[in-house]
C-alpha cells in the first residue's frame, strides 16, 4: 500500500494534479519528448592476438558452428556474440574484395557490355512470330460470311435490311413491265401483289371496282414479302396459269357480285347532304324521359 504513496514522477489524472517536472508535457503547444534512444553498444576493438585467432578460424571455415565460436571466444576473452558478428562482417568484406578484383581484371568496355549479355542469357528471346492464341480459336482475320444474293438483287437486300413500308416505293414503268412479262402465278397469295400508284386508292370510286385493285394501294403495307420474291412472279393477273375469275376485266367482275364501291355506301344515310350530320339527343340513353321521374339514391 505504501508503494503507491511513494513520491515519484508526478502524473496528471484528468488534468487535476499539475505539479511536477512533467507538467509542461501536458500542454499542447509543447512537443512531447521522444522515447529515449537505446544505448548503443560500445565498439569492440580487437587486439592483434585476437585478430590472429579469428583469422586462423576464418581461413579454415567462413561459417563456424556455435561450438567453434565459443572455443575461440574463450581463447580471446570475448563473448560468443561478438565473435559471431565479426564473422558476419568478415564474410561481407570478403565478398566485396572479390567483386573489386573482378572489376579490376576486366576492361571498362567489357564491363558495360557484360551486363546486357548476362541479362540476355537469363531470359530467352521471344520470337517475333509469337502470337497469343485465342482460346476460342477465332483469329483476327475472321469475318462472318454475308448471305449472297440467291435470286434477284431485291432478295439480297431483303435478307440484310429490315422491312420498312417507307422504303418500298412503286417500281418504275420499265421495271414494272418486266415484272408482268412472264412467270408463275401467285393465286394462293393472300393479297393481290400489283404495284399500283397510291393515288388509285384515294382518287375516285372507280378504283374500287375489283378486289385486286381494292388492295393495290395497301400492298406496301400489307405484303412485306414482296421484295423477297422473284422479279417476273409479282403479277397475279398475268401468266399462263391465271384463273378465269382473276383474268376477267373489272367491268365483268362488277357485273357478277362486285358492284362499284362508293365511300357513301358505307354510311347509313344515303343523302349526301345529311351524311355528316348526326343528331344526338342526350336524353335518349336515359330510361326515363320525364325529368320528374328521375330519382337519385344516396349510397
Swiss-Prot record:
Keywords: Activator, Developmental protein, Differentiation, DNA-binding, Homeobox, Neurogenesis, Nucleus, Sensory transduction, Transcription, Transcription regulation, Vision. GO terms for cellular component: chromatin; nucleus; RNA polymerase II transcription regulator complex; transcription regulator complex. Residues 97-106, 139-153, 236-247 have a biased composition (Low complexity). Residues 248-258 have a biased composition (Polar residues). GO terms for molecular function: chromatin binding; DNA-binding transcription activator activity; DNA-binding transcription activator activity, RNA polymerase II-specific; DNA-binding transcription factor activity; leucine zipper domain binding; nuclear receptor binding; RNA polymerase II cis-regulatory region sequence-specific DNA binding; RNA polymerase II transcription regulatory region sequence-specific DNA binding. Retina. It is found in: Nucleus. Residues 39-98 bind DNA. Gene3D superfamilies: Homeodomain-like (1.10.10.60). GO terms for biological process: cell differentiation; circadian rhythm; nervous system development; positive regulation of photoreceptor cell differentiation; positive regulation of transcription by RNA polymerase II; regulation of DNA-templated transcription; retina development in camera-type eye; visual perception. It comes from the Eukaryota. CDD domains: homeodomain (cd00086). Pfam families: Homeodomain, TF_Otx. InterPro entries: HD, Homeobox_CS, Homeodomain-like_sf, Otx_TF_C. SUPFAM superfamilies: Homeodomain-like. The keyword Nucleus applies. Coiled coil: none annotated. Transcription factor that binds and transactivates the sequence 5'-TAATC[CA]-3' which is found upstream of several photoreceptor-specific genes, including the opsin genes. Acts synergistically with other transcription factors, such as NRL, RORB and RAX, to regulate photoreceptor cell-specific gene transcription. Essential for the maintenance of mammalian photoreceptors. Belongs to the paired homeobox family. This is Cone-rod homeobox protein. It comes from Mus musculus. The lineage of its organism: Eukaryota, Metazoa, Chordata, Craniata, Vertebrata.
